[in-house]
Amino acid sequence: MSSRVRHAEASPRPSWLSSARFYEVYPQSFADSNGDGIGDLRGLTNHLSYIRDLGCNALWINPCFDSPFKDAGYDVRDYTKVAPRYGTNDDLTALFEHAHTLGMHVLLDLVPGHTSEEHPWFQASSRPDPTERVTTVDADRTLPVESVTPVGQTTPRIASLFDPRRRGSDCETSRGVVQESAIQESVSDRYIWTDSWISRGDGLPFIGGETERDGTYIINFFKCQPALNYGFAHPKHPWQKPALGPEALATCEAMLDVMRFWLSRGADGFRVDMADSLVKHDDDGKPFTIRTWQYIFSQIRPEFPEAAFVAEWGRPYESMQAGFDMDFYLDWRWDGHPNGYNMLLRNTDTPLEHEGDASYFNADSGTSIAPFLEQYLPQLHDCERASGTFNLITCNHDTLRTAQRLTERELKVAYGMLLTMPGCPFLYYGDEIGMRYRPLPTKEGGYVRTGSRTPMQWDADKPNLGFSCAPSESLYLPVDSAADAPTVASEAAREDSLFNWVREVLALRTEQPALASDARFDVVAAPVDGRVFAYIRTPAEGHAPTHPRTTADSSSAPAPAATRDDVSDRNGATGRPLLIAMNPGRGIETVELPSELRPDASMLLALGSPTVSGRTLTLPAQSFAILG
């Protein structure tokens, strides 16, 4: 296997990602259209114009597939059926169509590593008689039926009956004649089963005594989530199948057919849950999981070249090799040790409290941006040389909302940065109005995450803040009952609100080629002993992606860089380099304007009255500026 794989030579990254600005929606908490207390797809469709007008042109919808909801939909019972509480498959198709008319793209949330224990695959796989471990499926939906070996591959691929070229007649394969209407397939090895009811999991979490099958089964997370079988890196027991072996490839093909099902109906791609966890006992660097994804992408990309895939992986050197278009800078903190992203917004062991928070954007922390850059820049470099994107989030469904511990002014500075950095920005629903985390009892396996999943707050003059007309006791989760709970209506009406600041930043990002996801990024100022952070973004057109500067220098003087002329954007207009600068602290900071910035550069966006005198930008306390 090559040490570095780029699928872009055969299939470029989806063109629309260069200008993508994502909005993450937790469907059960966004908008309820039928009054049952749970958000649904029609409610989301009715609010697509709101998301577009906010400045986002792409959606990530958390799982909306049929599920018993023991883990909020990350326990899938049927990958090709919308959960009835959200609506129907037709409702989701209508959402795709309406989004596309608005110039928006939609990513679904794919959970490839496990299913619900109620999935028909698992129900069949758990039967005691091996001959009964089969499922019957429509021939145009799923199922591997024959082994073929593509040119250049030593492992067989499993052909899919989804291929329309195969429909319309009976197919004779190495496994017999298959009727066009439905076929049966064995799912005995669709999951990872040991060979005895007393067997343990070889270091992996396992469940025994729950089924009639003589064996225990491996789980990924909760008890209700049996792991799908993508094989083992180094099998050492008979029940452990090899990665990319026939059993693992059959699982790959089943998941490919899930992708095909929704992509053919209008989805524009997938955010992939726990993308790095497919192959068990994988080596450092995840080489077998990487090869598995390379195989999957080798099949799906020729069919859907504009489909985008973002990994929940968090290590772009690996995810880019695997073939993903995007990775997230995930928010992690282990035993008091923050990662770079955590240093920005949640650098504390008591995340609900402002005091003692050493986050960069806490005005009183006194911390520098340099430690963040030390971790961020090498990972950005990994993405850039693979022509992928490394995405920053404001928050997501798994993290605590930042508005609980940062003030509105601190959030404005933070979002100014997060929405102008390289990669595609991901805005979590409600963050634009400063929705707060609320300590709540666990719901559907949410535990501490539950408080970040509360209903969207639309209008204080409407029942349940406009989320639903259902009785309050019927709501999926309670709305914020505080008298000062922010709503879209209240924040839109307040000129200096966080909501209007986010709209301004996103509007500028929409207009400026220098703020595209693939525009060049160069650090200008990041002193170890200061609070200022400044960087220049240069439109990517006309030059190959280049490496950002990798030093967080101890002085605030700009690092040297070649002077650049205006660069033409996609529509033939000119796009100038932009300087983005911020001071989240309490003192005054200065930045020397870099040579790339035109002498006639103007202040395009400002917070806190920054000023320019000659070639010096002065940033008062808690200020932010974009010049270009």
Predicted segments, located by residue:
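C-terminal beta-strand-rich structural cap/linker in extracellular carbohydrate-active enzymes
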Residues: 614-628
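Conserved alpha/beta catalytic core and glycan-binding cleft of carbohydrate-active enzymes
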Residues: 117, 123-124, 133, 141-146, ...
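Acidic/aromatic-lined carbohydrate-recognition and catalytic surfaces
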Residues: 3-250, 264, 275-322, 456
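Beta-strand-rich binding/interaction modules
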Residues: 587-607
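Loop/helix patches that line or flank the sugar-binding groove of alpha-linked glycan CAZymes
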Residues: 17-18, 301-303, 315, 320-323, ...
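An active-site-proximal structural segment forming one wall of the substrate-binding cleft
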Residues: 248-270
